[in-house]
A protein has these predicted regions:
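Residue-level detection of beta-strand scaffold positions
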Residues: 14, 69-73, 98-100, 113
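Short beta-strand element of the conserved SAM-dependent methyltransferase core
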Residues: 50, 68-70, 103-107, 115-117, ...
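Second-shell loop/turn segments in exported
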Residues: 65-67, 90, 128-134
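A short, sequence-level motif marking secondary-structure junctions
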Residues: 32-36, 64-75, 117-120
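Signature of long, low-cysteine stretches enriched in small and polar/charged residues
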Residues: 78-124
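Extracytoplasmic/secreted envelope proteins and their assembly/folding machinery
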Residues: 74-77, 81, 140-144
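N-terminal targeting sequences that direct proteins away from the cytosol to non-cytosolic compartments
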Residues: 1-55, 95, 108-109, 121, ...
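A short acidic-to-branched-hydrophobic micro-motif
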Residues: 48-79
Length: 150
């Protein structure tokens, strides 16, 4: 695949310190990606974005992704809730030892699966998935199951 300095390979263990905008909350996120086909955004606004693609030179806003964002409160996670279409609640899922609520919805033309929960260290983690299969045994599921907090 073509190289892209804005989207380096995410192969193996990725450790990112997430920051909740406007607060002192931080969270050290550890997530392991497959050896091929996953890339991450080189720039961070306190989040981590992972992209499954064969060509990191062509990553666009509507492409499949898994995004990890730390927010200061549930109100920040639900900020755009009134804009969501077709919201359906999901069975909670334990990620990194934390039970998270789940939902699916359409927003800005994209379908999303989102898991969110309060972190023991403070703040709320939102994991937003679009265009990535997270059914049991898939790469997306393996990535979510690899999450730990440092």
């Amino acid at each position: 695949p073509a190289e892209n300095p804005d989207y380096p390979s995410a192969a193996g263990l990725n450790t990112q310190t997430l920051e909740a905008f406007g607060s002192d909350y931080t969270l050290v996120l550890n997530v392991t990606c497959p050896d091929q086909g996953w890339y991450k955004s080189a720039t961070s606004f306190g989040d981590l974005k992972l992209f499954p693609t064969d060509d990191p030179s062509h990553i666009f806003s509507g492409d499949p992704r898994i995004t990890f964002e730390l927010k200061s409160g549930l109100d920040k996670i639900n900020y755009y809730y009134d804009d969501f279409e077709n919201v359906e609640e999901l069975t909670p899922r334990t990620i990194g030892g934390v039970e998270m609520a789940g939902r699916t919805y359409k927003n800005v033309g994209m379908w999303w699966t989102e898991y969110y929960g309060e972190m023991p260290t403070g703040g709320w983690l939102a994991i937003k998935i679009s265009g990535v299969d997270i059914d049991p045994g898939t790469e997306g599921d393996t990535i979510l199951n690899s999450v730990t907090f440092g």
